[in-house]
């Protein structure tokens, strides 16, 4: 936001003066990807539109470990994952970065959980920034949540100590004593 940008003038100026913006973790590191145009072509080739739930069932047959499928956003896909032998599903819109018009994971969680009951573990990913967010997801039916930004922010700020601190904050926010006022 604007206030954050104003608080970091050196960074803002370097972004404004940058000649070109690129995906530094891919461009120049993957053969044939040198700019955003070739990145788009490379990305499109990474997905096989012919994949079906039968392929997922085949993977489960070949794999003797747990199969956890991330990206479930409908009850139908949840049931399909279950019928393929998935051990757990992760309700996730991948941070909204793939389809920014997709609903938030927390919005679809209750319907998906209701359609599956306790037949499969249901995890939720996306929007978890605090213990309250974890509690909300658990209350709506998630068996577990995943976090990303909270620990990444901690890592960026203080390294390993920051990750430890971020996790401690979330754990402390989940302390039952913190929610005694919610009990009847």
Task: Place the predicted regions along the sequence by residue.
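Conserved small/polar residues in nucleotide/adenosyl-binding loops
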Residues: 180-184
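Catalytic cores of alpha/beta
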Residues: 76-84, 129-140
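Glycine-enriched alpha-helix->loop->beta-strand junction motifs that scaffold or abut catalytic
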Residues: 63-65, 83-88, 118, 141-144
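Glycine-rich phosphate-binding active-site loops on the catalytic face of alpha/beta enzymes
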Residues: 90-102, 140-160
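Glycine-rich beta-to-alpha transition loops that act as phosphate-gripper elements at the mouths
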Residues: 69-75, 121-134
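C-terminal helical cap(s) of enzyme catalytic domains, especially alpha/beta-barrels
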Residues: 156-174
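Alpha-helix-loop-beta-strand connector modules within alpha/beta enzyme cores
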Residues: 54-63, 101-122
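Active-site entrance/lid segments in N-terminal catalytic domains of soluble metabolic enzymes
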Residues: 1-83, 95-98
């Amino acid at each position: 936001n604007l206030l954050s940008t104003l608080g970091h003038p050196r960074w803002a100026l370097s972004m404004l003066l940058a000649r070109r913006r690129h995906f530094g973790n891919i461009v120049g590191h993957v053969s044939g990807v040198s700019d955003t145009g070739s990145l788009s072509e490379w990305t499109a080739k990474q997905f096989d539109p012919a994949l079906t739930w039968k392929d997922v069932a085949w993977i489960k047959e070949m794999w003797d470990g747990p199969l956890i499928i991330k990206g479930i956003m409908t009850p139908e896909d949840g049931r399909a994952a279950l019928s393929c032998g998935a051990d757990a599903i992760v309700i996730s819109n991948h941070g909204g970065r793939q389809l920014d018009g997709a609903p938030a994971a927390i919005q679809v969680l209750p319907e998906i959980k209701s359609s599956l009951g306790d037949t499969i573990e249901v995890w939720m990913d996306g929007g978890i920034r605090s213990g309250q967010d974890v509690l909300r997801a658990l209350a709506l039916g998630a068996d577990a949540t995943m976090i990303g930004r909270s620990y990444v922010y901690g890592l960026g700020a203080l390294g390993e100590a920051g990750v430890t601190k971020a996790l401690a904050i979330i754990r402390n926010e989940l302390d039952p004593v913190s929610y005694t006022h919610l009990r009847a």
